[in-house]
């Protein structure tokens, strides 16, 4: 019984470590839709929302309507 418990705990720890390695170092993106997108405003909104170092945001026009823009926040996962 002790072997099974020890093996189960080892496997759970191994799986958790593998999941953490997969997400470390990746860049995630989230979209914000302000009424009027400006790069400085977008960048500050992203920094406020995620409260991390290395977060940045920029405005991008969507494919369908080039007059409206949205903000892309990029941050470390």
Curated annotation (Swiss-Prot):
Source species, domain of life: Eukaryota
Gene Ontology terms: cellular component: extracellular region
Alphabetically ordered keywords of this record: Antimicrobial, Disulfide bond, Fungicide, Plant defense, Secreted, Signal
Disulphide connectivity of cysteines: 28-77, 37-59, 42-71, 46-73
Tagged with keyword Signal: yes
Cross-referenced Pfam families: SLR1-BP
KW Ribosomal protein (keyword) present: no
Localization per Swiss-Prot or TrEMBL: Secreted
Descriptive protein name: Putative defensin-like protein 129
Organism of derivation: Arabidopsis thaliana (Mouse-ear cress)
